[in-house]
């Protein structure tokens, strides 16, 4: 019989231990890969959900804007009676049209228009500027070209730096939006703004 070789037995044990460690590491690697794959799948699903929610939010906002615009136009096209007292103004009345919420409706113009019926908001706007043209203290603040526009019921032109694209004239702004039940013909809810300021107001600036 051959003598037992203790070194050979130790070598086999070492090989078996190495194989076990290798298998264990492979198992760990496989589990890590599965975990990473699951994590990526969750991340992708979260991203897809977030994108879907954002698209839904944009769609809802778009639908709300469209509804508000339709509601606003509907109310502006309805007849109504002018209300409100306006505010006293000075000789630089429209200097405030380019800042904050704009310039107020002059009280003496409000006195002329109060309780009068208008076919729609365009009708009110024309009558408003016509009354401004008839007021000596207010009309003298405008150049000849704008005086002519006022007499025709047209809004005066703003300075070039206060215009935006084709919007070149002063505009009437509802301080409390019509879509939030702001009074269409409430002169205390109306401000005169430059086109640029009007756009900034509606952007929340």
From Swiss-Prot:
Q: Does the keyword Nuclease apply?
A: yes
The molecular function terms in GO held by this entry are:
endonuclease activity; metal ion binding
* Top-level taxon: Bacteria
Is Nucleotide-binding there in the keyword field? no
Record keywords: Antibiotic, Antimicrobial, Bacteriocin, Endonuclease, Hydrolase, Metal-binding, Nuclease, Plasmid, Zinc
Q: Which residues of the sequence carry a binding annotation for Zn(2+)?
A: 173, 198, 202
* CDD domains given in the database record: HNHc
Q: What is its EC number?
A: 3.1.-.-
According to its UniProt entry, the protein's GO biological process terms are: defense response to bacterium; killing of cells of another organism
Q: Which InterPro entries match?
A: Colicin/pyocin_DNase_dom_sf, His-Me_finger_sf, HNH_nuc
Compositional bias of kind Basic and acidic residues:
53-76, 88-99, 159-178
Region: Disordered; residue ranges are: 24-109, 136-187
As for what it does, the entry says: This plasmid-coded bactericidal protein is an endonuclease active on both single- and double-stranded DNA but with undefined specificity. Colicins are polypeptide toxins produced by and active against E.coli and closely related bacteria.
Q: Give the protein family.
A: Belongs to the colicin/pyosin nuclease family.
Q: What is this protein called?
A: Colicin-E8
> Can you name the source organism?
Escherichia coli
> Lineage in the entry?
Bacteria, Pseudomonadati, Pseudomonadota, Gammaproteobacteria, Enterobacterales
**Chain's gene name:** col
């Amino acid at each position: 019989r051959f003598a037992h070789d203790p070194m050979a037995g130790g070598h086999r044990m070492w090989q078996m231990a190495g194989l076990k460690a290798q298998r264990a590491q492979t198992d760990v690697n496989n589990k890590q890969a599965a975990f990473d794959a699951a994590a990526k799948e969750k991340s992708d699903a979260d991203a897809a959900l977030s994108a879907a929610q954002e698209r839904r939010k944009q769609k809802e906002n778009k639908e709300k804007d469209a509804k508000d615009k339709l509601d606003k136009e509907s109310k502006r096209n309805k007849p109504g009676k002018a209300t409100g007292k306006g505010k006293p103004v000075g000789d630089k009345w429209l200097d405030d049209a380019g800042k904050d919420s704009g310039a107020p409706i002059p009280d003496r113009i409000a006195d002329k228009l109060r309780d009068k019926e208008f076919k729609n908001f365009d009708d009110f706007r024309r009558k408003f500027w016509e009354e401004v043209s008839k007021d000596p203290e207010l009309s003298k603040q405008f150049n000849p070209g704008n005086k002519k526009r006022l007499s025709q019921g047209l809004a005066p032109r703003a300075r070039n730096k206060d215009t935006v694209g084709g919007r070149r004239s002063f505009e009437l702004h509802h301080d409390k939006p019509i879509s939030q039940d702001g009074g269409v013909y409430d002169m205390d809810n109306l401000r005169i703004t430059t086109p640029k300021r009007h756009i900034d107001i509606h952007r929340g600036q």
